[in-house]
Amino acid sequence: MKIAISYPPIVNQEGQKAMVSQNRNVQFFKKPTYLLPVIHAQAATWLRDLGYDVLWDDGNSQEKNFDDWYKDLIAWEPDVVVLESTTPVMKFYWSLIDRIKSHIPKSIIVMTGYHSMRKPEETLLESSTDVVLKSNHIDFVLKKLIPYIDEHENWRSNCPIEGLTIRRDEKEFYDTGNFRQIESLDLSPDVDRSLVNWKNYAYENGNFLQTPGAYATSVIRDCMFGKCTFCRYNGPDLTFSMRSVNKSLDEYQRLIEENGTKEIFDDSGVWYRGAEARAFARGIIDRGLHKKGCYFGFNTRFGYLDEETVSLLSRANFRFILVGLEACDQETLDRLDKGYSVEDAEKNLRLFSKYRLYPHLTIMVGYYWQTRQQLEKTISTVRQFMFSGLARTLQVTLCTPLDFTPYHRECI
């Protein structure tokens, strides 16, 4: 059975490529930027380990244009095509799915992603999609679904795997119930870096000061906080799962010693905190990985790391600390349910800077309530943080309503 895990090149009128994976807020990049879809890469590895013929088909990182990517996919004639999408590009995907079905009608199309998982019937009605995964645990579900399809001709009628909406025919859909919210992440394999052509992601990424870099297998799936109104990792249908410290340390050691990786970034919604964060830093030091010329980085929240932890992280050669500032007026922070103030942010930035970490600020603009005065306050405060040395780098994006988050529903 042949399975393609596919990411088509999506280019807008300005020549910018859409990145639909590993993002809390969809982005279009003019400068080449290739982000490894970690959970889908774990799924690809798991299916390959089960004996399936897996094609890692990321047209973006392979620098293909759309026509070449599409031609190659159709020529391979996969039995299953797994796609991932998000709100701003759903119509593109619906059209693409119908086109794929017109050329390889027997292929089973599986849609993943936070937009379709929250409204699966929409994607089934708007396209020829066969299955919508309602789970964020793509790897765990595909590991069960693909063998079931392979072994049961009537899989559409009686599939017992939870967290799916399945097309029985043109108008009838079959829902298998809620997905399992918490999984034991240690059961999912580390990403096979050769399978996903890891070097395609190792250089063109602004998060890396040194290359080759790599995204680690995430230690937290989704987010421990899970309340920010704009973020897809939000809602009563989601919680978080955690990977063990030792399993993650083993992967870091392999990435450094076998792949020669010079920077490792963990793109978990929010990385470890407290005891796990300190244990991880001590593990890096105990294994001598902090002396291998490799930097480490992760996402966190203001207020999640105390001074003892930050000190240990600094000793362990952590560098890049990505934190979501989002805005610098309290009304916006409260409406986004961020759970901190600008004063809290400044206090944390001073702590990071004291221990020579490199805070990277993420800011968004374009909130539907945002006034010029609020925007100017954000600009002036961020300028102060940057020019006083409290932050090293920053990125600014438009706040895009997506994936039926609370912010998206407010905008609707």
Question: What do these predicted regions represent?
Answer:
Residues 3, 54, 109, 161, ...:
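Hydrophobic/aromatic residues located in beta-strands of well-ordered beta-sheets
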Residues 3-32:
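Short glycine-rich His-centered loop
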Residues 12-16, 274-275, 331, 335, ...:
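Flexible glycine/acidic-rich beta-alpha junction loops that bind and position SAM and/or redox cofactors
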Residues 39, 46-47, 52-180, 404:
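Glycine-rich beta-alpha loop elements in corrinoid/cobalamin-binding modules
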Residues 50, 102-106, 153-154, 285-293, ...:
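Short helix-capping segments at alpha-helix termini
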Residues 56-60, 84, 232-235, 363-365, ...:
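Residue-level recognition of beta-strand->loop/alpha-helix junctions
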Residues 120-126, 309, 369-384:
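Catalytic cores of alpha/beta
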Residues 186, 191-359, 365-367, 380:
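Radical SAM [4Fe-4S] cluster-binding motif and immediate context
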